[in-house]
Amino acid sequence: MKNFLAQQGKITLILTALCVLIYLAQQLGFEDDIMYLMHYPAYEEQDSEVWRYISHTLVHLSNLHILFNLSWFFIFGGMIERTFGSVKLLMLYVVASAITGYVQNYVSGPAFFGLSGVVYAVLGYVFIRDKLNHHLFDLPEGFFTMLLVGIALGFISPLFGVEMGNAAHISGLIVGLIWGFIDSKLRKNSLE
C-alpha cells in the first residue's frame, strides 16, 4: 500500500485526502456547516468568496458518490499527474471546477456538490490524449463508449430517484476533450 501511494502525485493525493476528510467531517455532524461554507455562490454577497467556485467539488453526498468519484479521479487524475506533472492536473482541476460549476449553476442553481464534473474533464483529457498520441495511456477499446453510457445514465437516473449533475458531467467532458486536443496539437507542433 505504501508503495502504491508513493507512486501517486501530490495533487492526486491532496485532493483525494481533502475529499475524504471533508466527508468524514460531514459524518461527524458538521454537514450543515460544510454545505454552507463550500457550496457554489448562491447570493450576490458570496460572489467575491472565490473558494466557492471550486470548493463544491470537495463535498460528497453519499458513500457511493465519494467512492465513485475518487476511484476515477485517483486512477485517471493520477495518470495525468504522473505523465504531465502536478501543475497540469492542478490547472485542469481548477479550470474544470470553475467551468462545470458555472454551467451546473446556470442549469439547476447552486445546490450541487461533488467531483464528477472534474472527473469527466479528467476522463475526456485522458481519452483524447490517448487517441491523438498513439495510445499514450493504453486505454481499452470502448473507453469513450463507457463515458457516453455514464452520461446517458445520468439522464435516466431521476427515474430511480437519483439526481445527477448532468450539466457538470457534459461540460466537464467537453473541457477535458478540448484541453487534451489543444495539448496534443501543441505537442505535435513542438515535435515538428
Swiss-Prot record:
The organism's place on the tree of life at top rank: Bacteria
Ranges per topology, Periplasmic: 32-57, 104-107, 163
Main location, first listed in the record: membrane
Enzyme category, top tier: hydrolase
Compartments where found: Cell inner membrane
SUPFAM superfamilies: Rhomboid-like (SSF144091)
Cytoplasmic side: 1-10, 79-82, 129-141, 185-192
Record: active site: 116, 169
GO CC, alphabetical: plasma membrane
Record's keyword annotation contains Metal-binding: no
EC number(s) per entry: 3.4.21.105
Chain segments annotated as transmembrane: 11-31, 58-78, 83-103, 108-128, 142-162, 164-184
Leader sequence segment: none
Keywords: Cell inner membrane, Cell membrane, Hydrolase, Membrane, Protease, Serine protease, Transmembrane, Transmembrane helix
InterPro entries reported in the protein's UniProt record: Peptidase_S54_rhomboid_dom (IPR022764), Rhomboid-like_sf (IPR035952)
PANTHER family hit by this protein: RHOMBOID PROTEASE GLPG (PTHR43066:SF26), RHOMBOID-RELATED PROTEIN (PTHR43066)
Stated family: Belongs to the peptidase S54 family.
Function summary: Rhomboid-type serine protease that catalyzes intramembrane proteolysis.
Name of protein: Rhomboid protease GlpG
Source species of the chain: Haemophilus influenzae (strain ATCC 51907 / DSM 11121 / KW20 / Rd)
Gene label: glpG
